[in-house]
Amino acid sequence: MREKIAALGLDVGKKRVGVAGCDGLGLIATGLTTIERTHFIADVEKFKQLVEERDIKVLVVGLPYSMNGTLGSQAKQVQNYATRLAKALQLPLEYVDERLTSYEAEEQLKAQKRFSTYNKGLVDRQAAAIILQQWLDQRRSLRLIELEDNL
């Protein structure tokens, strides 16, 4: 029997954090909510509720690399926030390269005729879903490679 996948995908911004979850099989990521950042302790309480409700085992955070592959100041701020959050929630933390996910999220929402410049939270949730989906797809690919190697 396959292990249940219980991950939260996060698109961390200065004002908001887009949050995504996935089905238990780890096939499909879906945007769940957007958390308006206030102060860190209040943010942690909001995340604790999600972690308990969904029995989360890992945080997957998008890391905004520069186009040349380096970590800029925004990426370092995301790392700092994510590290503190993972420690407060006592969860392991994994990163995914999130270059252009907000752009991709906007394009997906436009294609679905759901995009609005007034609803930034929707874009944040969609970006979080893209981040988590990348992580799920990478895990699945690695598992397939391991299976092929064992044949």
UniProtKB/Swiss-Prot annotation:
HAMAP family membership: Nuclease_YqgF
The record's annotation in SMART domains points to: YqgFc (SM00732)
Enumerate the GO terms in the molecular function aspect: nuclease activity
- GO cellular component terms given for this protein: cytosol
Name a single GO biological process.
rRNA 5'-end processing
Enzyme Commission number, as recorded:
3.1.-.-
Nuclease: is it a keyword of this entry?
yes
Say yes or no: keyword ATP-binding present.
no
Keywords from the UniProt entry: Cytoplasm, Hydrolase, Nuclease, Ribosome biogenesis
Fetch the InterPro entries from UniProt: RNaseH-like_sf, YqgF, YqgF/RNaseH-like_dom, YqgF/RNaseH-like_dom_sf
- Protein name, as recorded: Putative pre-16S rRNA nuclease
Superkingdom, natural source: Bacteria
Localization per Swiss-Prot or TrEMBL: Cytoplasm
To which species is this protein native?
A: Gloeothece citriformis (strain PCC 7424)
Family, per entry: Belongs to the YqgF nuclease family.
The primary location reported for this protein is cytoplasm
Query: What job does the chain carry out?
Result: Could be a nuclease involved in processing of the 5'-end of pre-16S rRNA.
